[in-house]
Amino acid sequence: MKAVVSKLYCSSMEEVMVVRRRPHVVNGGGFVVTDYKEKIVFKIDGCGVLGTKGELVLRDSDGNDLLLIHKKGGVVQALSIHNKWKGYSYDYQGSPKPVFTLRDPKHSCFSITSSIRISVGPGNCYFDVKGYFPDRDCSIVDSKGNVIAQVKEWIGSRDIYKVVTKPSVDKAFVFGVIAVLDYIYGESTSC
């Protein structure tokens, strides 16, 4: 898989990452991602920290912004059968660069599909979310049907779960998608 955000976050081997939700009361919500050595890899902040509804930021372990993700609004969006989220990274000059678009079907009688689809770049590169995120039982699958990442339940805890990423998968992209799923389902990044 080609890097979506940065090749710095691609690994040559499968990795298991641990996600810990932060309480809204103490840290404004969001979550922290650690590796198997319990070293922080990513931090995700939502509106509890940012103060803006429908906006998320994925940061690296040093606090540098990697992805700005926001929910599209406006009249056209209100008439659409999908909620649309856009993820932006920053180029070397600090300008935002579009990275992905996630389409989440609105709950209505007009919705034909319940699949969450992520489009990356120009062309036909897309991913689907299969399964149900709130149950910690879902996968991100590429257009060929290959699982690139899996969200799995951590036994005994609702606030901790694990994410398994396959080799050469951009983990920053994966956790950008997971941040949106967290928000969509009203969890730690939502208001």
UniProtKB/Swiss-Prot annotation:
Listed Gene3D superfamilies: LURP1-related
Q: Which organism is it from?
A: Arabidopsis thaliana
Question: Can you say what this protein is called?
Answer: Protein LURP-one-related 6
Which InterPro entries does this UniProt record tie to the protein? LOR (IPR007612), LOR_sf (IPR038595), Tubby-like_C (IPR025659)
Member of which family?
Belongs to the LOR family.
Q: Which domain of life is it from?
A: Eukaryota
What's its job? Answer: Might be related to the phospholipid scramblase and tubby-like superfamily of membrane tethered transcription factors.
